[in-house]
Amino acid sequence: MPPPLTTPLTTLLRIQHPIMLAGMDQVAGPELAAAVTNAGGFGTLGGARYTPKMLKEMIAEMKDLLDRKDAPFGVDLLLPKIGGGARATNYDYTGGHLDEMLDIIIESGATLFVSAVGVAPQWAIDKLHKAGVL
């Protein structure tokens, strides 16, 4: 069998295969994220509309399903722009708990933070990078 394909993505994320699960709202739950990670790809847990407590529980459930407890994984939160020219239908999916949710992501040992909708505020990016989260 040929060796696994090595790419900048596989090297950066410490994965076998250059396959990355999209955070896909709550569809990319603990079972799917763990399955992708266990298969050698990069599992990303979708964290849309979770409370901090729910996010912590979902991450714990996913980690329980991992074959390797130190396996890399990511968390995706929806952070659309609010106010200042943003669409009137945008709202804060974190319910004002972004800072607490970032603490949970950092404490969980997540490798990567994803914001598929919107750009995280600079303070959040700085906090994640300072903690070693990509």
Region locations from a protein language model:
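Active-site entrance/lid segments in N-terminal catalytic domains of soluble metabolic enzymes
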Residues: 1-134
